[in-house]
Amino acid sequence: MGKTSKAKQSKILRQGSKKAETLSKKISPNTKNLPDHHFKLVKVKRGLDGLGLFAGEDIKKGEIIIEYIGTILNKEEAEKVTTSMYLFEVNRNKTIDGSVRWNIARYANHACDPEGNAESDIKKGRVFIKAIKNIKEGDEILYDYGEEFVKEYIAPKGCRCRAVKHDYGAKGHVSK
Ligand SMILES: [Zn+2]
């Protein structure tokens, strides 16, 4: 995790949580019993690739499921992190290192188009996982991680999603 101290991390967590809570109540007032970066009930259990994130209730297309949270890094700090698979580049000078335990969104696995039922949505410097299809309780929540990640981490071991053709970026679509 580089040089970010525990104290700094918890400060970031508190700030992030407060904002997420406000937004959460605005968007979905019935979620007050959920952890504050959760907008919908989710479960973590064995999924497509290791642990996965599952819908704990029916989720409608367009609804926000969960916020992707973590330690906020600037460009310089992000460049020093070479061990995390959970870096999410929000913009040129803001990267979220989502490898922290309290970022439940990190459990959502990748799926190639059109097998995903969610997408990552950047809003005002924050990252939300949003449903792009109606999702039934018990379904695994899957979204396209993007070309760069797929090329680096998924293509070498082979994608496990149910797509007939996997999108391995530069190499183009490759069949199973
Ligand atoms: Zn795939």
Residue positions per predicted region:
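C-terminal SET catalytic tail plus cysteine-rich post-SET Zn-binding segment of SAM-dependent SET-domain
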Residues: 2-12, 17, 112, 117-176
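Catalytic cores of histone-lysine modification enzymes
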Residues: 13-119, 174-175
